[in-house]
């Protein structure tokens, strides 16, 4: 089985669409071990609490664009800190930003997809630095960020064509930190 070294149950969270892949993998492997791995299906806009975290799954602008992929607004309820995790997604639509605003979300940290790096437009399913800047301005319009919010550009690939140094130089002038493997952020 899977997770034999685990002394606790591993809880996995994702969309119904991802659950199909999860189930398929176990079926192909001929292994099911729900005593060690438990899948929880998340639905867009339905708040879920996991430990001290309040989480709002939001449809990503990715995949089939039918709520099959999710991005996450995560609030640590005890510390009253919030993270907007926007990877594998284009710019969230106005409806989604309004939803988060109506929930009173104000993000202390925003982790941005920047697959397109310095390209003018990375398409609808990912973002570039230029699209990151557009999203940041939209979040300001909806009062989803404050003056001390930290922005991290991440989720790069060779498709963007920039080295780490070039990406860092391009993003830091906009107050955006370029991530790297092993990076730890305290906020």
Cite the ranges covered by each PLM segment.
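Alpha-helix termini
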Residues: 1-7, 28-32, 76-79, 102-104, ...
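Active-site HxH/HxHxD metal-binding segment of metal-dependent hydrolases
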Residues: 1-35, 40
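Hydrophobic "anchor" residues on beta-strands that sit immediately upstream
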Residues: 12, 84, 109
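Hydrophobic packing residues within well-ordered alpha-helices of enzyme cores
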Residues: 21-25, 167, 185
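Short, conserved catalytic or adaptor-binding loops enriched in Gly and charged residues
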Residues: 29-34, 48-49, 169-170
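Active-site regions of enzymes building and remodeling cell-envelope glycoconjugates
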Residues: 36-40, 55-56, 171-178
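Core dinuclear metal-dependent hydrolase active-site scaffold
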Residues: 41-102, 182-187
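Cap/insert and terminal regions of metallo-dependent hydrolase folds
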Residues: 90-183
């Amino acid at each position: 089985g899977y997770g034999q070294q685990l002394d606790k149950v591993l809880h996995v969270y994702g969309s119904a669409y991802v659950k199909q892949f999860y189930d398929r993998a176990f079926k192909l492997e001929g292994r099911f071990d729900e005593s060690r791995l438990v899948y929880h299906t998340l639905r867009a806009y339905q708040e879920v609490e996991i430990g001290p975290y309040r989480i709002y799954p939001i449809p990503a602008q990715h995949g089939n664009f039918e709520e099959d992929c999710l991005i996450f607004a995560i609030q640590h309820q005890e510390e009253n800190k919030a993270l907007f995790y926007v990877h594998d997604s284009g710019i969230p639509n106005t409806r989604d930003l309004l939803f988060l605003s109506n929930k009173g979300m104000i993000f202390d940290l925003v982790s941005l997809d920047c697959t397109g790096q310095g390209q003018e437009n990375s398409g609808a399913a990912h973002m570039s630095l230029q699209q990151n800047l557009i999203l940041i301005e939209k979040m300001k319009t909806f009062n989803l960020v404050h003056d001390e919010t930290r922005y991290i550009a991440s989720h790069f690939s060779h498709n963007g064509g920039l080295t780490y140094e070039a990406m860092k130089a391009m993003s830091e002038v906009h107050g955006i930190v370029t991530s790297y493997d092993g990076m730890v952020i305290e906020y």
